[in-house]
Amino acid sequence: MRKPPIISEPSNKEKKNILFLIASIGGGGAERVGTRLVSEFSKNHNVYLMYFNFKEKTFPISPNVHLIPFFVTNELKKEFYPKVKDSNLIRILEIEKVRRRYNIDITISFLFSPNIYNIKAGGGGIKILSERNDPEGKGDSYFKEMALAYEKADKVVFQTNYVKNKFASEIKKKGVIIPNPICVSCLADKIPKKKIVAVGRLVPQKNHELLIKSFAIFHKIHKEYYLNIYGIGPLLDQLKILVYDLGIQNYVNFKGFCDDVHEKIKDAEIFVLSSNFEGMPNALMEAMMMGLPCISTNCSSIPEIIDNEKNGILVEKDDVSGLARAMLRLSEDEILREKIRRNAMRKSEEWRLNKIVSKWEELFY
């Protein structure tokens, strides 16, 4: 385990001591974005990454980043008991110690609990909180608690105007729009296979039921196509039953989780996102950057990513026949696919890592 060196003062006036708070360094899209950003920040700043949950699989991180894992174990609780019984308070007290020890200038946090810790912990210089979700899917209590935290923050980073505009004017004034940085390992094949793909957790939010029902209609006309779904989740068995009930079990494949998903989907003809709500979906943006023609439900912030009929096709939520028609259009119109592919790649230039890092660094001074 790497131990961070004590730095009493930045060696360079322009360098900042930055503490980054996140739940873990493995798992979901927010964690992947967070680890990618801190690795870039560490090229110009002293960066400390504090995380609170253990994950077996972790995302790659630059060796320049000083890792500070802090897991509240039963043994650790005994050290604080009976004065402190709350695990969250133990984390907050540790954040305060880290801020003092490393003379932190800026503290950045991702996701709900780290955002709360950032605000409640003393010290830490400039406090930048980042909203990574659409509050619509999180409930009223989540929204109210985050709004209270944002009121106390110095800056709040939103991924989209759609989410930013849900908050009061005082919060919007300190809000900044910075999309996710997107990186892909390969581009789409020039000659695709008869394949439709989707990438996402098998949970109600992603609404794979809509996708499967639409594909069943589409498949009656184009029997040569296959649907590959990448992702794991609690709805797997339920979705498999639906596939069998629709009689398309030989044409729908549940591929599970894979590290090299870009390589797996690059030969597809169409990418589909069928979600009920989204923050800023990395899977869709990565598919666009690869040059895959994309269809998405018209939900949450998606219209800020897809300009309908130009760089993708939008369909309404839960519109089974509408999604089937969109699949038919793209599969049968090569000129439309090429136009959408080209415009999607042009749009994705906005999400290049160097551009996103520059926007973040503007907040540091």
Show which residues each predicted segment covers.
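A conserved mid-protein helix/loop that constitutes part of the nucleotide-sugar donor-binding site
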Residues: 31-36, 194, 198-220, 229, ...
